[in-house]
């Protein structure tokens, strides 16, 4: 595939001056700088004495929680016992999962069902996938289920009553009554229609009543917007109220080293259907792609989310021998400067969070944690750190101890120099504690609905849906059964939660050591899922390339796998995003602000008047040039 010369993928966004500034605050520079300093002692000001001082061996700091008589005696026996039990339970868990897979393959997926399923898995486009999904629904008799409104997982009587009222008032043009009904029903998960179970009984679509209700709600909101039925003040208050109750949707891209590159396919599938939310968060490897999306318009992304993007991951890191030498010299496999140069393309140079928001209207969030053990995680965005340079936050979010050293966040000063943020405090990989920062997103941006693209290989084994998941129903007993039968699912749940119990014991009793000065106990015990969780299908050989950039062929496969994993979720996402976009459109009608709009006018996130004032004030405050003492 030939790429036009003027394409976005051929541009270079390296800013050498910023790289030189950043280099002054890296661990390697500090070490070399300290070696050049000649330290002396003196008896008095006129009689200096060059004294050979033998440096004392550094001792680890004491932790008051780990002091005591019994702790050092029982710690290692308890940890050995806990790990032994955990290993045994994990072995039984894998055996049960193997039984469930064999049960489904040999008993459920046979004959015509297996043929239709294979065709579904081979679909390359969403239109092709949807056609084959409907054929599979027809084979399993799911069409009859869609026509029957009765279902225990949502309030079908309430939804039916509201749907009838919307149709009646709109056709009779009773606008005051229509507004009263909209005030009641335009809210998150009204009547349970945002329940994932509604989309977990079929391969495509859901209850016809739910689809009719969403379509009617869409028509009513379009009528209010297009016909201007109310005064500007009434309309503004109405859509502010809708937005507060309905909330926003966030796209969360997890970490996972090179596994995170599978997010490219997820993003491509959402982009093709114009369903990328305006609130996006990324951690570790996911932060790199989140930055790419939030610094480009939709037209630019169509040129970038292709296999040829693999060339931008390449960096001069050398072979394994070079990486080993670098590790013994610096304590990390990768060099911060080379990483910064690579990241600059994805972040469109040295854009700050505020500049990226003004350019695309998308809200970028990067999760990082301070390098010390006990400080709380930090979510970097245009509100909390408007002048922070995006690539520095992305590198910090990728800084896994031993792989990349913790780095300071870099901020654009009043004179446009880069200076360290937060007095040079260093940050590292946010996925060690908060891979998916849902609570922070809800607090700062009123996020009520989350789409999580999860690629962390160490937690994939824990994700199992005994009653099916969105777009992937249980085929046993026409969706009314359990995966592997009730006994198989019951054993899976028991063993999984027993493993989690032992992990909690290890963390609560502080049995786990802290290698490289990092608390690793939360790696398995976070919340890794969302309202919708997308799991791209990975390959075992991906572990071999876990710290390597992709080739064009590998990235092509990853894009296809990411899209295939996203296709089953698009109906659910579209039902939510359709209403959310109309609410945003209604809010923007009477607020012609440049903030929150893309430069091409195609996307954007409107904010309340208070949000706009805060953003403008934050963007006008630039830190002064100060020297940070390292």
From Swiss-Prot:
Keyword Nucleotide-binding in annotation:
no
- For this protein, what reaction is catalysed? a triacylglycerol + H2O = a diacylglycerol + a fatty acid + H(+)
Q: Which GO terms describe its molecular function?
A: triacylglycerol lipase activity
GO terms for CC? cytoplasm; lipid droplet
Key words of the record: Hydrolase, Lipid degradation, Lipid droplet, Lipid metabolism
**GO BP annotations listed:** cellular detoxification; lipid catabolic process; triglyceride mobilization
> What family does this belong to?
Belongs to the PLPL family.
Q: What is this protein called?
A: Triacylglycerol lipase ptl2
Native source organism of the sequence:
Schizosaccharomyces pombe (strain 972 / ATCC 24843) (Fission yeast)
- What gene does the UniProt entry assign to this protein? ptl2
């Amino acid at each position: 595939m030939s790429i036009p010369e003027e394409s976005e993928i051929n541009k270079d966004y390296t800013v050498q001056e910023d790289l030189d500034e950043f280099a002054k605050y890296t661990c390697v520079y500090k070490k070399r700088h300290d070696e050049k300093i000649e330290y002396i002692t003196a008896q008095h000001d006129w009689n200096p004495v060059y004294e050979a001082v033998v440096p004392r061996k550094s001792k680890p700091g004491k932790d008051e929680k780990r002091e005591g008589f019994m702790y050092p005696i029982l710690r290692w026996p308890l940890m050995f016992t806990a790990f032994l039990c955990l290993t045994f339970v994990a072995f039984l868990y894998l055996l049960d999962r193997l039984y469930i897979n064999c049960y489904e393959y040999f008993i459920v997926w046979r004959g015509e069902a297996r043929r239709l399923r294979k065709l579904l898995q081979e679909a390359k486009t969403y239109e092709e996938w949807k056609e084959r999904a409907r054929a599979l629904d027809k084979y399993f008799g799911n069409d009859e289920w869609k026509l029957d409104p009765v279902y225990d997982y949502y309030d079908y009587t309430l939804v039916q009553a509201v749907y009838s009222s919307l149709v009646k008032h709109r056709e009779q043009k009773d606008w005051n009554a229509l507004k009263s009904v909209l005030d009641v029903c335009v809210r998150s998960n009204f009547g349970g229609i945002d329940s994932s179970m509604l989309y977990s009984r079929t391969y495509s679509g859901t209850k016809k009543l739910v689809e009719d209700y969403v379509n009617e709600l869409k028509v009513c909101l379009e009528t209010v917007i297009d016909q201007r039925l109310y005064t500007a003040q009434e309309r503004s208050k109405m859509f502010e109220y809708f937005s507060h109750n309905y909330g926003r949707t966030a796209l969360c891209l997890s970490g996972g080293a090179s596994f995170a590159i599978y997010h490219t396919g997820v993003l491509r599938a959402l982009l093709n259907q114009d369903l990328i939310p305006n609130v996006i968060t990324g951690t570790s490897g996911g932060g790199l792609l989140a930055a790419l999306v939030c610094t480009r318009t939709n037209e630019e992304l169509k040129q970038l989310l292709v296999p040829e993007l693999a060339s931008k991951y390449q960096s001069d890191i050398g072979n394994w021998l070079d990486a080993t030498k670098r590790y013994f010299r610096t304590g990390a496999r990768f060099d911060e400067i080379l990483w910064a140069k690579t990241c600059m393309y994805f972040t469109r140079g040295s854009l700050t969070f505020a500049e990226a928001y003004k350019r695309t209207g998308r809200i970028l969030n990067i999760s990082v944690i301070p390098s010390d053990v006990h400080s709380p995680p930090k979510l970097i965005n245009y509100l909390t750190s408007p002048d922070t340079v995006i690539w520095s936050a992305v590198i910090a979010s990728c800084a896994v101890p031993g792989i990349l050293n913790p780095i300071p966040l870099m901020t654009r000063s009043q004179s446009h120099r880069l200076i360290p943020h937060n007095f040079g405090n260093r940050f590292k990989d946010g996925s060690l504690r908060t891979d998916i920062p849902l609570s922070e997103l809800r607090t700062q941006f009123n996020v009520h609905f989350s789409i999580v693209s999860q690629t962390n290989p160490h937690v994939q084994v824990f994700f199992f849906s005994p009653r099916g998941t969105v777009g992937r129903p249980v085929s046993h007993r026409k969706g009314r059964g359990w995966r592997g039968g009730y006994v198989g699912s019951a054993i899976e749940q028991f063993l999984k939660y027993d493993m989690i119990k032992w992990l909690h014991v290890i963390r609560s009793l502080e049995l786990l050591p802290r290698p490289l000065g990092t608390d690793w106990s939360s790696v398995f015990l976070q919340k890794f899922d969302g309202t919708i969780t997308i799991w791209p299908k990975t390959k075992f050989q991906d572990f071999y390339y876990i710290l390597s950039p992709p080739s064009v062929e590998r990235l092509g496969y990853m894009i296809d796998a990411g899209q295939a994993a996203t296709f089953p979720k698009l109906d659910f996402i579209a039902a939510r995003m359709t209403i959310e976009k109309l609410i945003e459109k209604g809010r923007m009608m009477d607020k012609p602000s440049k903030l929150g709009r893309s430069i091409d006018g195609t996307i954007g996130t409107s904010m309340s008047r208070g949000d706009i004032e805060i953003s403008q004030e934050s963007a006008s405050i630039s830190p002064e040039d100060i020297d940070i003492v390292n």
